[in-house]
Amino acid sequence: MTAASATTARVERIAMGVTCVATVVGIDSHDLAVRCLDLVEEIESLWSRFIPTSDISRLNSADGQPTVVDDRTLTLLHHMIAAHQATEGAYNPTRLPLQIAAGDTHSLINDRSTTLAANATVYSHLSGIQIFHDGKVSLPRGMTLDAGGIGKGLAADFILQFALEHGAQATCINLGGDMAINTGDSIGWDVEILSPLDPGVILDTVRISVGGVATSSLFARQRNSAGIASHLFTDSSAHDTQHTVGATVIANSAAWSEAWTKYAILSNPAQAIDTLTNTGLAAMLVSADGHTTKTESWKTFTHD
């Protein structure tokens, strides 16, 4: 009997408000890729602010009452807290009231919408989040969370691990630009970094063998005539679109990459490059005029 050989499957689906792509190398690669995208939808049902029964929606409407959530949601919350601390508050998942006030109330792919309680407010710290040993979580009254980009990044990390545990030899999970990759060798796969100003322009190509790469821009919640001009905020207002408008960060996970893109965009460019360099991260920033600024370590991932 001839042993089955590995094949490569690439399957895509719209979920989490973005195009999700699972690329899997292995035996039964197509079936595994489909299962990966099924898992995207399962995680979306836990974390979407547009689904009233999701863990995130239930926490946001609990008015401070302890709420039982999935173990994966507990992991998400721990990542949120760690990212908020590491980025000195640049990543802040409590800014949903600002997004809603700016008009970001509806899903970009269906007719679902988000409504918040009248007391919803932005918090400058996350120390009030209580995570109990029995799997319950309590948010301070008025705090609302948005899984957003870090949710997509963490979902990509979860699903990459799922694929590897189920026989994949190599996998790339790409959830709208938040990518978790393990090629199973040192060669790596090429990732094209597109301009946030013109998606038809490739700014650079990086090669990743293991880890995460995330690209974020101010315009991520804007599609055609829908959405808002800038979806990233400081604690009081939308970020000025005349400064950094997009960033790509390479790290050891998609979730961590995604969190640091927020820091990169919301910070002074020179300060961002210094901090990212000192943190050991490779990054590229894009300004409003299309100019790119890169950390010194960026070139270790390119073909130059």
Segment roles from a protein language model:
Residues 1-304:
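Mature catalytic core of soluble alpha/beta enzymes
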